């Protein structure tokens, strides 16, 4: 790693400085023949970075982590986590580095983080590397989520390294540069909790909680019990996030506790995908054999993950364990209602229903529609856009029943409201695969076209009809992979 005095970027090291017990200073591995595959110019501008400079050798060095600003302290972050329900006490950034924090043009602190930058002390048996396909998948899906208005980490760039990486076959290596409000996870607190338990001292755990409050939930600092208020804020953020996932048919695929953020942002797009035909049991991940993280299970899994977060905060919330348990149990109990409220409100909007439509009528319309979509194996995203056209007087092109349509039309749905929340374009699985396959062979044109469509997901565009259509029948069953 080289250090540059270039003033093009200033990186701070607040996490490394305030929480050294959760950070190991480390260096990225050099790339033999780096080549910039994709750069998010708009995000670069938002971060106060010069996109032209990022395309230069020095800029690409930053995106690889091999050329960092003077004073920066890249670290691999420590965290634990429940993976498919089983606890792993030491996970951490096995192939990732936090380069540092920067201040964007709006004054917000953002992490600059790398994925695929080489082995760290947390790598266990892994090679620490990443390949082009999965890194571009995260770029595609995270930016699509952002365009849909869903809280998420962002993707700044993907750089091909020129190194061959062995997975099932030889594949081209790559590094993803991503941006987040932070990379604090439930797993970060699990690691700090076990550290504090072993040391018989809660000081590290308290420092982590204070860091989280300062960065993400500053209003909690004013509460009578700041750490309980922190927990309540994370519960609310996750309830909102999960509802937004469900409303657009997003399936994360690997909702381990180390993949749940304290900021309430979606993180770690591994075996993720968007649902096509509606079915609550939909699973795409090749490693989720039991369907633990199926579409319909996601709210319950989030609730379970938050219970694990609550356990780590007990020593901070009250000296008496029973009192602390009672307090977090009450707070955790708010999650189902908060999720249901956000989901119900979102579904009313997707159907164009005004506040004049009573709750019972709206709920029946939603539930009956979902049953109908599942029975007819109708594409979830297409169904709501079709209803928007029906609300304007068109004939339905999908198999809605006359009885359901009659009840819905009687509610005078607003098609303009519907079109503002029901996307035309999502990262269709077959189109994502086409783009990744082409990019792996050096053809970036399908990726560029797909990203153009996804940038404005609610606006129909001439020439992009294929990007709004479901997969052809011969696409077959879809499976996703972690890429690790």
From Swiss-Prot:
UniProt keyword terms in alphabetical order: ATP-binding, Magnesium, Manganese, Metal-binding, Nucleotide-binding, Nucleotidyltransferase, Transferase
Any Pfam family matching the protein: SelO
Coiled coil regions, renumbered to chain: none
Keyword Transferase: yes
Cofactor dependency: Mg(2+); Mn(2+)
Keyword presence, Magnesium: yes
Catalytic reaction annotation: L-seryl-[protein] + ATP = 3-O-(5'-adenylyl)-L-seryl-[protein] + diphosphate; L-threonyl-[protein] + ATP = 3-O-(5'-adenylyl)-L-threonyl-[protein] + diphosphate; L-tyrosyl-[protein] + ATP = O-(5'-adenylyl)-L-tyrosyl-[protein] + diphosphate; L-histidyl-[protein] + UTP = N(tele)-(5'-uridylyl)-L-histidyl-[protein] + diphosphate
NCBIfam families xref list: PRK00029.1
Protein name: Protein nucleotidyltransferase YdiU
Lineage: Bacteria, Bacillati, Actinomycetota, Actinomycetes, Mycobacteriales
Gene: ydiU
């Amino acid at each position: 790693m080289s250090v540059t005095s270039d003033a093009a970027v200033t990186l701070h090291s607040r996490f490394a400085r305030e929480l050294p017990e959760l950070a190991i200073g480390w260096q990225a591995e050099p790339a033999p023949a780096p080549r910039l595959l994709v750069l998010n110019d708009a995000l670069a501008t938002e971060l106060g970075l010069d996109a032209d400079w990022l395309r230069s050798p020095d800029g690409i060095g930053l995106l690889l982590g091999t050329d960092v600003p003077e004073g920066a302290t890249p670290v691999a972050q420590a965290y634990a986590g429940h993976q498919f329900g089983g606890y792993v006490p030491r996970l951490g950034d096995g192939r990732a580095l936090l380069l540092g924090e920067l201040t964007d043009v709006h004054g917000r602190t953002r992490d600059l983080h790398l994925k695929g930058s080489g082995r760290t002390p947390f790598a266990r048996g892994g090679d620490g590397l990443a390949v082009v396909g999965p890194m571009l998948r995260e770029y595609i899906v995270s930016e699509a989520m952002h365009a849909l208005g869903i809280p998420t980490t962002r993707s700044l760039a993907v750089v091909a390294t020129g190194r061959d990486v062995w997975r099932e076959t030889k594949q081209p290596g790559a590094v993803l540069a991503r941006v987040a409000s932070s990379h604090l996870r439930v797993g970060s607190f699990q690691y700090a909790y076990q550290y504090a338990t072993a040391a018989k001292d809660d000081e590290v755990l308290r420092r982590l909680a204070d860091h989280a409050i300062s960065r993400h939930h500053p209003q909690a600092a004013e509460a009578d019990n700041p750490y309980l208020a922190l927990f309540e804020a994370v519960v609310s953020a996750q309830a909102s996030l999960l509802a937004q996932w469900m409303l657009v048919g997003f399936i994360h695929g690997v909702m381990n506790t180390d993949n749940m953020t304290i900021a309430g942002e979606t993180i770690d797009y591994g075996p993720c995908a968007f649902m096509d035909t509606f079915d609550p049991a939909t699973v795409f991940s090749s490693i989720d054999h039991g369907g633990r993280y199926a579409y319909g299970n996601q709210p319950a899994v989030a609730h379970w993950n938050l219970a694990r977060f609550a356990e780590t905060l007990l020593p901070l919330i009250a000296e008496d364990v029973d009192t602390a348990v009672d307090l977090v149990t009450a707070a955790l109990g708010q999650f189902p209602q908060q999720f249901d409220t956000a989901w119900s409100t979102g579904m009313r909007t997707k159907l164009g229903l005004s506040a004049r439509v009573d709750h019972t009528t709206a709920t029946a319309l939603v539930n009956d529609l979902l049953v109908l979509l599942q029975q007819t194996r109708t594409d979830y995203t297409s169904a709501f856009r079709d209803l928007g056209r029906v609300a304007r007087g068109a004939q339905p092109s999908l198999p809605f029943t006359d009885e359901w349509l009659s009840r819905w039309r009687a509610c005078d749905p607003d098609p303009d409201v519907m079109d503002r929340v029901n996307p035309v374009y999502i990262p269709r699985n077959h189109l994502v695969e086409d783009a990744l396959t082409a990019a792996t062979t050096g053809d970036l044109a399908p990726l560029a076209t797909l990203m153009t469509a996804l940038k404005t997901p609610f606006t129909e565009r001439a020439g992009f009809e294929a990007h709004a259509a479901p997969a052809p029948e011969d696409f077959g069953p879809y499976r996703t992979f972690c890429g690790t």
